[in-house]
């Protein structure tokens, strides 16, 4: 046997010996597992209350807030709607929504995080008035992180603006695969 083969044989035999003496526990748990449970619970609670939660995502500057203002003004006399604005630190969009529509609009500061998860969404919902028909979560402007975290929303939507380029579905496939609706803006 070659010297290197002897070393490999020795190490393999040693590993087998220790494997018999040491109990090995394989832990294969998704880091998203707990959030998934929380999101499912939140969806069930919202369904009981008759609240439809929409998670709106896109990159910064695609027109989320402007589109929301136009949509809210078209529906606010028919249903009770409120908005949760998520941003790393700013409250500009929450103020803009409130001033332009007159509806309830709250700001969720993520403290540097580029997404919201189910627990963060719940905190926002707990601060909205009762009796809503529609709660809209305007997620942090980003095409990567928000797609990875289930917020507990009934539906996910995104806005894609034409100036961003035609390659976004290729660069960010997860975002496009989890969305129920994609709005094309700035055509």
Task: Name these PLM-found stretches.
Residues 82, 157-158, 176-187:
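Conserved beta-strand/loop subsegment of P-loop NTPase cores
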Residues 151-152, 174-178:
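Short, conserved loop/helix-junction motifs that constitute active-site signature segments
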Residues 58:
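The Walker A (P-loop) glycine that initiates the GxxxxGKT/S ATP-binding motif of P-loop NTPases
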């Amino acid at each position: 046997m070659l010297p290197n083969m002897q070393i490999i044989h020795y190490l393999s035999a040693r590993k087998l010996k220790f494997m018999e003496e040491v109990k090995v526990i394989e832990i294969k748990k998704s880091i998203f597992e707990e959030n998934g449970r929380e999101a499912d619970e939140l969806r069930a609670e919202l369904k009981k209350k008759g609240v439809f939660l929409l998670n709106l995502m896109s990159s910064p500057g695609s027109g989320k807030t402007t589109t929301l203002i136009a949509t809210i003004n078209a529906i606010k006399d028919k249903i009770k709607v409120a908005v949760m604005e998520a941003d790393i630190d700013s409250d500009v969009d929450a103020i803009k929504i409130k001033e332009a529509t007159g509806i309830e609009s709250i700001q969720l500061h993520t403290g540097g995080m580029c997404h919201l998860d189910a627990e963060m969404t719940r905190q926002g919902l707990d601060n909205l008035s009762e009796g809503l028909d529609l709660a809209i979560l305007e997620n942090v402007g980003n095409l990567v992180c928000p797609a990875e975290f289930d917020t507990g929303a009934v539906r996910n939507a995104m806005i894609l603006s034409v100036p961003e380029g035609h390659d976004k579905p290729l660069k960010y496939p997860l975002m496009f695969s989890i969305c129920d609706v994609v709005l094309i803006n700035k055509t």
